[in-house]
């Protein structure tokens, strides 16, 4: 077959002056597969172009890149109502990705649907269940042994229903997606909040709950509230110690943890070209920490280089032909615009306890002294889905190499997490891994590990005040090691490496000196490393399982006595009545993430067993009544006890309950267990000042009522000992508030209004008891 460019030239001559887009015609002749693993699933830029043109004609204005990709995947572009921040869009994603902790519940729900095969390309990635304890291979062997039942379930379910399966040790889902599945213009949903990582390759990649994934795998259009678009214009260029991570650390400081809610963050401007493709992925990945729906960069030559180096030059060539649809239109409108001069940007470090508390590295030491944060760094950790690229490892190794040249090793413990088997094998071949070991590092398994709390930490006791510095994305209280007194900071991997060598937050590598083994002072030079290996990537071990062509004989077994897996029972339908005298299970004080609602770490092993995982319901949330975690008053016995035990007591005695929350309730992970658990234990509504996007959708999917105070000050009117009645459900309608009657123990009452974001389809989920119940109703 002729080279792609030659085919284009011939078609141009053949078409002459006829008004066709050359690539649209070429798509008929030179189909390009979405990935090497699915040779019969093709990229449909022709359909993307057609849909964009329909929408452009309707809206009659320039489009942002986000709009092009999102609207280009509309189920009905000719008739879909489109209004940013208001209407719900019905979309057709190109593919689904699931990590092993969330895939269990997603596949259990898909099995319940009764469908024979997934309708779109889908994959499962084993990365969340591997605990960091001793180091790479030993931890991997241990995980395979402990989680054999779950891995077998996921592998056989994947084989049965046509889902690709990436075995334990293959790497972190988002790195695997970037290496194999993401491409410019793709619409991908993943059951992990850091799915936006794929925006570094020009795709719209969105984190969702498992129920959303089930809809898409079932071939049902996926609903998303039409996102607003926040533009971040980048000028200047990165240099020295400043890295791509500093861009998102700066943006997080500007927008805060909820500033991106309901919006796509779209980076653009001349500064983009100074950032590598994997650097763009880092920025998009951590956009989850500002609540953004996703983040995206425009297609450019850095993405083309990455596609070519990862064996996908054919996709890059096709993207070149359709580039007009993979970049924003000139003059497009952003709902908010932020400008950052990369030439003036300084290295940042954010934390502790929240990823939006931003400090220049030069200032964090003095701030820590003032605030009483521990200055000594106990552990430095690099890697994770945010920062585990070849370039990241190379820049960290460049710092480590300088220390070694002066006879130094890390003063702090130091761990390295490769993002994938391909990255691990390549950094071993090119010597980076050995340099990082020589400086005192331990190379962990290709998995999430300490970033999600899978860390058997031995150097401290629970409650001991200490500081760790990571290149991760999230630093909520107790997230990494379950110790609420661990002060976790996030920064770039090269800054982590420098700080681990110095051992203190007071060290600024841009200005400060270290003392070598010979007693002489020296300063670390800004690291420099290749963004991609000069030779080809080393793929390492084969860790992929293709689904068989014929799966008719494939069995998927779930033992009724299993403590790890449990088939799902349908939730009860709405009984047609208002919710009377709801007991308040807990009134939450302050930040309440999905980690607080459904903890990870040791609880990950129960992610496929709803009843067992429900024993962690809200154990991290702070009760406003007593200022304690996992201690609430039982309204019947008047005794204080654990939240899950109290919820089970209420369920056993037929007492329906509600949770009262604060701002941005449910921020963080996409885990739908944080919605399944309250539903399973008898919850009916969650009332807050505001919700994080994914969690709000997950609650709706499970038949719960996520409601917000029409007046946020009404949060203060409710006391943990009150009872609530929610009225107006018989006339439940989009945009129409519900009424809440607060009944105080002294007999007095107050009436407040509660808002919601339900549309007609979502109201049907509530009436049916869940989105899955509604799907089954529609199949009859």
Swiss-Prot record:
Its cofactor is [4Fe-4S] cluster. Residues 524-560 are annotated as: Disordered. InterPro entries: Acnase/IPM_dHydase_lsu_aba_1/3, Acoase/IPM_deHydtase_lsu_aba, Aconitase/3IPM_dehydase_swvl, Aconitase/IPM_isomerase, Aconitase_4Fe-4S_BS, Aconitase_4Fe-4S_dom, Aconitase_dom2, Aconitase_mito-like. Keywords: 4Fe-4S, Acetylation, Iron, Iron-sulfur, Lyase, Metal-binding, Mitochondrion, Phosphoprotein, Transit peptide, Tricarboxylic acid cycle. Forms covalent cross-links mediated by transglutaminase TGM2, between a glutamine and the epsilon-amino group of a lysine residue, forming homopolymers and heteropolymers. It is an enzyme of class 4 (lyase). The modification N6-acetyllysine is found at residues 50, 138, 144, 233, 517, 523, 573, 605, 723, 730, 736, 743. One of its GO terms (molecular function) is ferrous iron binding. [4Fe-4S] cluster binds at residues 385, 448, 451. Binds 1 [4Fe-4S] cluster per subunit. Binding of a [3Fe-4S] cluster leads to an inactive enzyme. GO terms for biological process: citrate metabolic process; tricarboxylic acid cycle. CDD domains: AcnA_Mitochon_Swivel, AcnA_Mitochondrial. Residues 524-537 have a biased composition (Basic and acidic residues). This is Aconitate hydratase, mitochondrial. Residues 551-560 have a biased composition (Polar residues). The modification N6-succinyllysine is found at residues 31, 50, 138, 144, 233, 411, 517, 523, 549, 573, 591, 605, 628, 689, 723, 730. Substrate binds at residues 99, 192-194, 474, 479, 607, 670-671. Catalyzes the isomerization of citrate to isocitrate via cis-aconitate. The keyword 4Fe-4S applies. It comes from Bos taurus (Bovine).
